[in-house]
UniProtKB/Swiss-Prot annotation:
Binds 1 heme c group covalently per subunit. The lineage of its organism: Bacteria, Pseudomonadati, Pseudomonadota, Alphaproteobacteria, Rhodobacterales. GO terms for biological process: electron transport chain. SUPFAM superfamilies: Cytochromes. Monoheme c-type cytochrome, that is particularly expressed when cells generate energy via aerobic respiration. Heme c binds at M37, C142, C145, H146. This is Cytochrome c-554. The gene is cycF. Keywords: Electron transport, Heme, Iron, Metal-binding, Periplasm, Pyrrolidone carboxylic acid, Signal, Transport. It comes from Cereibacter sphaeroides (strain ATCC 17023 / DSM 158 / JCM 6121 / CCUG 31486 / LMG 2827 / NBRC 12203 / NCIMB 8253 / ATH 2.4.1.) (Rhodobacter sphaeroides). The modification Pyrrolidone carboxylic acid is found at Q21. Its main location: periplasm.
Length: 153
């Protein structure tokens, strides 16, 4: 075997496990994002039902749901969106390439969502009107990020 092709073959065999590991790490990040969003949706469902007056307002339930939501929101960070995890690059991803094109704006939207979740935590157990106001702000914060950075279904 000639030296150059042998070297290329050796390099490719050595690099393949690293590439597979990177792909698995990206897959895990996407799974983690989906799990996190599912948990947030669960808590938002409780709060949204009360805000829309579809379920009776319960200060204790609202406070706990808002506390959980705020804790979950604090976990979201740009690090959960590594390069290579965009729609078309990774299976099951809904992350648009704009995340990596406008990283500062993306990080700012995450911070806005965290702030809105913290305000929800402070308001949810107070009364229905406070919950409803905080829900509008939280919905706007979530929507602004999803509108720009998430592929529509």
């Amino acid at each position: 075997m000639r030296p150059i092709p042998a070297l290329a073959l050796t390099f490719s065999l050595v690099a393949m496990p690293a590439l597979a590991q990177d792909a698995r790490q990206i897959e895990r990040m996407i799974e983690g994002r989906h799990g996190l969003m599912t948990l947030m949706a669960h808590e938002l469902g409780k709060l949204g039902g009360m805000a829309k007056e579809e379920t009776p307002y319960d200060a204790e339930v609202a406070g706990k749901a808002a506390s959980n939501l705020s804790a979950l929101a604090s976990v979201i960070s740009p690090e959960l969106f590594p390069k290579g995890s965009a729609v078309g690059e990774a299976e099951d991803s809904e992350a648009l390439p704009a995340i990596w094109e406008k990283p500062d704006d993306f990080a700012q939207k995450i911070s806005g969502m965290e702030e809105a979740a913290a305000k929800m935590q402070a308001a949810a157990g107070t009364d229905l009107a406070s919950l409803q106001g905080a829900m509008r702000d939280l919905g706007a914060a979530c929507g602004s990020c999803h509108e720009t950075y998430r592929q529509k279904d």
